[in-house]
């Protein structure tokens, strides 16, 4: 076991600098901004961004193990700026090589890319402000960066721990929110990872997500194949999980799901991102895009120089929609965990934990069932078991069983011909990537 490396380093990042704060406080009480208050005093408001790019020095915090390298910027809201998979050279979080703000945030400047942590309102009032930080090596060989603040709007306290473990290909987030006041307060928490997109990418929502909501649940449409008008655009059985099929700026949030994951996959690069968290604590599963049309392309140019389009896969804790706030009582602390991990070579995931992700697809034309798996650590002699549930409480039927060595560097795949699957009673008429998904199949790793 190799210990996780942790260090602080000065880095130079090309930057379009924000202007000076307005000296006058602003109390925009009736501002319509996803339920957030415009009364952000004592935060100052910045309303100008420079058109000139300069090299600027930032303090960066790094975590690195055998599989991942993570960079954080405490001077910019404590965001994760880069998350890099060393096994395949893939940035599983959108890596914006420049700091190029636009006036999107609650107090003005906001940047795309990385993972932003939105609280107590959206977008985070201090998203462009420095936060306090410290870091430590832990006894088990892991290492943690702690970043936090006492936010200015409600005087509540938020602390986030970012941890890497030895020999684990995932990032653990440990959040602690504390109401240090004598009054009940409201908050929301949405971790906001950006992912690079192109014509080969698809958002990976659990299979029980069959409808999605707009902000405030003011509109709803079927998912993934949209039928009807949404954001004033007409869809006729179009897969809106694919970036290339959404021409206009669009948000959607899962109506409900009993699964603990959400993600994205790039079929061109055969790699993607997964977020894993207890869906009872973190029910929020959202996608936002500027759209692939001309409006979206203009925003790409406004937010980056060369890194192209992205989408946001926001993950909400204690809420499934924006705006939807949660109460935190006087002296109450809320603790919760979220996990982000890369994966590769297995396509549109059907289920995932922090230990493994699995996919199963049946190709009617080829007459083959393909089962694949990815693990976040070395699993020697892992048992792969494919079963069908028995009828009327009977024992499960074992379709296939094998042992194999798996790791973040070595994924698993098996193809089972139709002749071996005669006992399968039925399959669903799914349309994900031209394949069909078996009904009732269980894959255990």
Where are these regions (language model features)?
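Short, aromatic- and glycine-rich surface loops/edge beta-strands on solvent-exposed regions
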Residues: 384-386, 422-445
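Extended, loop-rich substrate-binding clefts of extracytoplasmic carbohydrate-active enzymes
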Residues: 26-64, 112-169, 199, 297-326, ...
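Aromatic sugar-binding surface patches on proteins
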Residues: 406-427
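A contiguous, surface-exposed recognition patch within enzymatic or periplasmic domains that forms
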Residues: 2-5, 9-26, 61, 71, ...
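Short proline/glycine- and polar residue-rich coil/turn motifs
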Residues: 327-332, 403-410
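Surface beta-strand/loop "capping" patches
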Residues: 346-379
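Beta-strand-rich binding/interaction modules
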Residues: 367-402
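Asparagine-centered strand-capping/turn motif at beta-strand->loop junctions
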Residues: 176-183, 373-375
